[in-house]
Every structure is written in C-alpha cells, then in structure tokens.
Amino acid sequence: MDDYSLDEFRRRWQEELAQAQAPKKRRRPEAAERRARRPEVGSGRGEQASGDPALAQRLLEGAGRPPAARATRAEGQDVASRSRSPLAREGAGGGEQLVDQLIRDLNEMNDVPFFDIQLPYELAINIFQYLDRKELGRCAQVSKTWKVIAEDEVLWYRLCQQEGHLPDSSISDYSCWKLIFQECRAKEHMLRTNWKNRKGAVSELEHVPDTVLCDVHSHDGVVIAGYTSGDVRVWDTRTWDYVAPFLESEDEEDEPGMQPNVSFVRINSSLAVAAYEDGFLNIWDLRTGKYPVHRFEHDARIQALALSQDDATVATASAFDVVMLSPNEEGYWQIAAEFEVPKLVQYLEIVPETRRYPVAVAAAGDLMYLLKAEDSARTLLYAHGPPVTCLDVSANQVAFGVQGLGWVYEGSKILVYSLEAGRRLLKLGNVLRDFTCVNLSDSPPNLMVSGNMDGRVRIHDLRSGNIALSLSAHQLRVSAVQMDDWKIVSGGEEGLVSVWDYRMNQKLWEVYSGHPVQHISFSSHSLITANVPYQTVMRNADLDSFTTHRRHRGLIRAYEFAVDQLAFQSPLPVCRSSCDAMATHYYDLALAFPYNHV
C-alpha cells in the first residue's frame, strides 16, 4: 500500500510540474481532467491529497519513504494554501523553502524573548555575567527587558575588575559603572597612544651636588637613589613634587663627604633600605620619618640585597652568610633566619606572596639555593653546572640564566624551576652569548622576557618552551628589560633606552644617555629610567669643569604619559620653576620663565 502511494504521489507531482511549465491556456482542461480522475483514488488516500505537494517536495529531495502518521487538518490546510500561492508555483520547490524561512524569521521577530517570560531577574544576571562588553551591547538591543539586564551595575562592575580598572574600589563607589568602564577604556586608549607617539612630559630628578650615582630602585612611582657621598634620597613622582627628602643616618658625627658609598638601595610601599660599602644596613619606615628604624652591621661588604615587595622582609648576603630580617609582633626588628653557603652570593631575591614565613632564592656561582625562614632549611635547586648569570622569581617559579659551554658543546640557556616541587620545568634559549637579565615577575602570563650579551631582547613562551620573538635592540649587552601585554622597554650598556611594540615588531622610540641603563620600571602611565656609571670615582667638580662633572655623575629620568604634552618639546626641569624661585649652586641654575604658567 505504501509503495503504491509513493508512486501515485510522484506521478501527481510530475503532472503539476508539467502544468506549471505549460502555456496558461492548456492548464484548464488538464486541471479539469485531473479533477475528474481525483475521485478514482481511494478514500484513504484522499485525506492526504492536500499535503501531497509538500510531501512530494521532501521525497524529491531524498527524504525517502513518507511518514506513516498522517498530517492534521490544520497542517494540511496550511500546506495546501502555500501550494496554491503564486510565489510557490513560480518557485517550484526552492521558492517555497525561501518563503517559509522568511515567514519563520518574521514570527521570531514578533515572539517574546525567552528571558522576558521564563527566567527570574537574578538568574538572568547570573547567565549574563559570562558575557563580555560586546556581547552585552548586543543583548541590550534585543528588548527593553534585556536592555535593563545588560546594563546592570553588577555586570559592569565585574567587567571593570576583570580588565584591571579601579581594582581597589567597591560597587557602591559609583552609580553608573558602565560609564566608568567607558571612561577607563578611553583613558587606556589615550595612554597607549601617548606611549606610541612619545607624547607626555619628561623630567630629570635633581642630583646631589658633587656626588656620583651608585644605585637606583623604584616601586609604584616612588624612586630611591644612593650616592657616593652616602646620601639616600627619595622622590614621589606620582605627585610631581620633586623636592626629595634625604633619609638621614644615625651617625651624626660623620663629616660630610666622609661617609661610605652606598652599595644597594631597595624600596617598597612602606620601607626603604640602603646597604653601604662598610657592611652597614639602614632600614627606614617611610610612614614614620626620615630616620632609620633599624640598623644592622655585617663584618664584610654586603654583596647582595633583597626587599620583599609585599611585606616587611629584608635579605642580605655578606661573605658566606645570608641573613633574613623581619619585625616581630611588637614591631621590633630581628633576625628571622640565617644561612651559610659555601660560595659568595651574587644574586638574591625574596619570593613574593609567601605569607607568614619568608622564602628567598640565592645564587652563588654554580649553586642555586632555596632558603626558607620557617625552619632555616636550605634546599639545593641547581648544582654542578655552568655559573648563574641572572635571576628573577615569581610567586611559584624561579628563572635564571646560565653560561654556555661554547658553540661546540652547549649554548647559554635560561632554566625555569618550580619552587613548590623543586624540579626543573623548562630549558629555554640555547644561544651563543650569555643572558644578562631576565624578567619573570612583571611579564604577562605564560610569557617571559630576557636580555642577552648579543644585544637582543627575546620573548619566551613558557607553554611551548620556544622563543616567540627576538629583537635586535642594542649595540652592546642588554642591562635591563621589562614588558607588558603589548610593549617592551629595554636598556643597554651603551646608554640607550628603547621602546618596542612587540606585536608589530616595531621600535616606537628611543632615548640616549652616556651611562649604562641599570634600572627600568614602568606602569600604564609612567616610566622611570636610571643611567648609573660604572666608575664611581668623583671627577673634578670645580667651576671650570662643570660639564665634565655633569657628564660623569649619572642620570634619573621620570616620564609621565598621562599629560597632553610632547615629551621632547617640553621645557627642561631647570626651566619649570615659578617666577619667584631662582636658586643657584655651582652655576647649576634653576631658571625661571614667566611663560611656563601661562
């Protein structure tokens, strides 16, 4: 019975196609003849006659045998009405599908969205929280209810937190977080444009007279510098108030110029630390005053100094001893742990985010130690290999460069170790020249940047272990490097500071000074660079050789890209004084121009 019905449907469909192609005058007798033959078909097949064209369309497309169940009367009327429409007759099959698709699209436009009639508001918020800003904007165009959900304050507050805007704020601080998000993105775009176009302001931090710069460090826009005279100065570049206070020492009986040179300086949000050539260590609390809160003495010269960036922990290395200092519950400083190593320590870092008990990493020649203050445990991470050339740590990893054994054997590499497991994770590089600096803590996730003796800056992919990008940045060795999600700032031994857009593999701009670049630190809106001379012996600083003295004393520059001013068209720092401020010292004039404030 089913085979007979299938043959009958195919025969009738072929007749209808022939009638659609025949002249109009021949359609009427053929249609009358077809109507005369229609009662001959059985009563069981007559109920399906109205749905024959739609069924035949599916059969001609290869749908196979017709379904066993019969269509309802409403469905049959709907299909029959579509089969009698002129557009369906002219389309002859393909047109019917297009018309049906158009009708379905129009019906969907008139339907009420699912969230408007089914879901509670809180559940809709939980679903929308997984959308980004573009998807939220599209959802706001669906209906009025979706617009209210897509512009909820909770969603835009979470977007601000996810993209790093206003991380310390709460949801009650602002009334329209969508507007705040737009303003933050506009500011971010402006800062990126200023970085690329070298648009902003640059200042040279005031130098201590008759001295040579020894060491520079910075944290969150606060700069600390040590000099050959034993002076230590601190600048807060966030307020553009460059009248830097001196951090005094306890030895008031020392005559000016008789204090030992400063070897190392470090700073974080609350502490400043300075190590001197005679083995003394001064610790200042920036919140209480300019006098040190603790003074510690080593028997020999301090070879390495480290300061934790998130708590009050100081680590020093002198001779074969490594000492960790931290305050107790009453606030008095004490020795938290003391270690003895068989070789002299060249590199020392404190692991961040270690909570109560500090952990340090020390490199001594061809040995690498993990030092834990909790039980004074000394764990050997790396031994009996090439000497270590550079070091950096993150919360759970340590990366250090090792010397190569020559191009015949093995090149210089960077080894990445897990601090928790104490085993090697990656071996990166394998280049001819030695790595001179590595930055793991400030790099984006799964990336790391390094500098080499060959003057090249390399980006390493920590997932694959390959070199993602290699830039020929400097003529001499790279001395400092830092990267973020789109740019690299590097400093070389020749005194050149270069800014690169590594996504485009393009150098944006560069600045030159006569001394090696020892320190580089930047944020989204500022950049701090320090050129420290190798030779710290004071040259003749009399009036006749003032230019020689200025050339050999070092330089600290602070760049600010949040202002709408060309960096290299701005007036020099000596020309930024007010009209009533005119000071001189050894002809180092602070000139005053009235048009500066016009």
From Swiss-Prot:
Is Phosphoprotein a UniProt keyword of this protein? yes
For whether the record's keyword set contains DNA damage, the answer is: no
GO BP terms, alphabetized: cell population proliferation; cilium assembly; Golgi organization; labyrinthine layer blood vessel development; negative regulation of insulin receptor signaling pathway; positive regulation of dendrite morphogenesis; positive regulation of proteasomal ubiquitin-dependent protein catabolic process; proteasome-mediated ubiquitin-dependent protein catabolic process
Q: Where are the WD repeats?
A: 201-250, 259-299, 300-340, 341-383, 384-429, 430-475, 476-513, 514-561
Chain intervals for the UniProt region annotation (Disordered) = 17-93
Q: Which residues carry this modification: N-acetylmethionine?
A: M1
Q: Where is the F-box domain?
A: 113-159
* SUPFAM superfamilies documented for this protein: F-box domain, Quinoprotein alcohol dehydrogenase-like
Q: Which GO terms describe its cellular component?
A: centriole; ciliary basal body; Cul7-RING ubiquitin ligase complex; cytoplasm; cytosol; Golgi apparatus; perinuclear region of cytoplasm; SCF ubiquitin ligase complex
Q: Which Gene3D superfamilies match?
A: 1.20.1280.50, YVTN repeat-like/Quinoprotein amine dehydrogenase (2.130.10.10)
Q: How is it modified after translation?
A: Phosphorylation at Ser-85 by mTORC2 promotes FBXW8 stabilization, allowing its translocation to the cytosol in response to insulin.
Location in the cell: Cytoplasm, Perinuclear region; Golgi apparatus; Cytoplasm
Keywords (A to Z) from UniProt: Acetylation, Cytoplasm, Golgi apparatus, Phosphoprotein, Repeat, Ubl conjugation pathway, WD repeat
Q: Compositional bias (Low complexity) at which positions?
A: 61-71
**Organism superkingdom:** Eukaryota
The GO terms describing molecular function are: ubiquitin-like ligase-substrate adaptor activity
Named in its record, the pathway it takes part in is:
Protein modification; protein ubiquitination
Could you tell me which InterPro entries the record lists for this protein?
F-box-like_dom_sf (IPR036047), F-box_dom (IPR001810), Quinoprotein_ADH-like_sf (IPR011047), WD40/YVTN_repeat-like_dom_sf (IPR015943), WD40_rpt (IPR001680), WDR55_POC1 (IPR050505)
Q: Where is the composition biased (Basic and acidic residues)?
A: 29-40
Phosphoserine PTM sites in chain numbering? S83, S85
Subunit arrangement? Component of the Cul7-RING(FBXW8) complex consisting of CUL7, RBX1, SKP1 and FBXW8; within the complex interacts with CUL7 and SKP1. Interacts with GLMN isoform 1. Interacts with OBSL1, CUL1, CUL2, CCT6B, PFDN5, CCT2, CCT3, CCT6A, CCT7, VBP1, CCDC8, ARF1, TRIP13, PDCD5 and GORASP1. Interacts with MAP4K1/HPK1 (when autophosphorylated). Associated component of the 3M complex. Interacts with POUF51 (when phosphorylated on 'Ser-355').
Function according to Swiss-Prot or TrEMBL: Substrate-recognition component of the Cul7-RING(FBXW8) ubiquitin ligase complex, which mediates the ubiquitination and subsequent proteasomal degradation of target proteins. The Cul7-RING(FBXW8) complex mediates ubiquitination and consequent degradation of GORASP1, acting as a component of the ubiquitin ligase pathway that regulates Golgi morphogenesis and dendrite patterning in brain. Mediates ubiquitination and degradation of IRS1 in a mTOR-dependent manner: the Cul7-RING(FBXW8) complex recognizes and binds IRS1 previously phosphorylated by S6 kinase (RPS6KB1 or RPS6KB2).
Q: Which PANTHER family match?
A: F-BOX_WD REPEAT-CONTAINING PROTEIN 8 (PTHR44019:SF11), WD REPEAT-CONTAINING PROTEIN 55 (PTHR44019)
Protein name in UniProt: F-box/WD repeat-containing protein 8
Q: Coding gene?
A: FBXW8
